[in-house]
Amino acid sequence: MAADGRDGKKIDVDPKLLELLACPLTKGPLAWDPERGELISRVAKLAYPVRDGIPIMLPSEARTLSAEDVLAPPPRLSGPA
């Protein structure tokens, strides 16, 4: 899974890492949004950034999801199935 980083390079998130990560507030699952390079917690309504391939799992660094973001279909995972 990849998204563009700040310098235009692709940022990859290992699918196995995604399976292990959980929202630090709800302990629930996260979804990868490759378009924004964020890990999404729909329950907490937060989007955690991924910088240089490293998930920043601090609630203070997370973006609050809008009502539209929460209601939107979950992002599709890219890469091999």
UniProtKB/Swiss-Prot annotation:
Family: Belongs to the UPF0434 family.
Annotated protein name in UniProt: UPF0434 protein msl4429
GO cellular component, one term: cytosol
InterPro entries: Trm112-like
Cysteine disulfide links: none
The organism's place on the tree of life at top rank: Bacteria
UniProt cross-references to Pfam families, sorted A to Z: Trm112p (PF03966)
